[in-house]
């Protein structure tokens, strides 16, 4: 009886360990991720609006869940120093996301912005936050 209980407990602990590892989305510190500020899913802020932003570079992806009082996706990301760039004639030209730099003039790389899987027709600085929508910034190198 004791042996059976110990076996069951050992199996349960092993399963818990496996599920815990699987639920931790952590990216290795290689390639463009070498300079990344965060390499695992993170939560930020305490505002009334929720913004979910996926950051994809190379084959890796992390998700940021941001609670904010801001109205735009860009302001929510800037509030937590998750993006930076240059103001241009079409709005904010994002050069850095999560510490990862993309500069088209240097190596033909840039950050593409998606709203629920569709390429965005607006920039992050003008895109209003919509609850339940997933936004994505993807590192693209031509």
Per-segment meaning from a language model:
Residues 2-13, 18-142:
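Ubiquitin-like/PB1-type beta-grasp interaction modules and other compact soluble beta-rich domains
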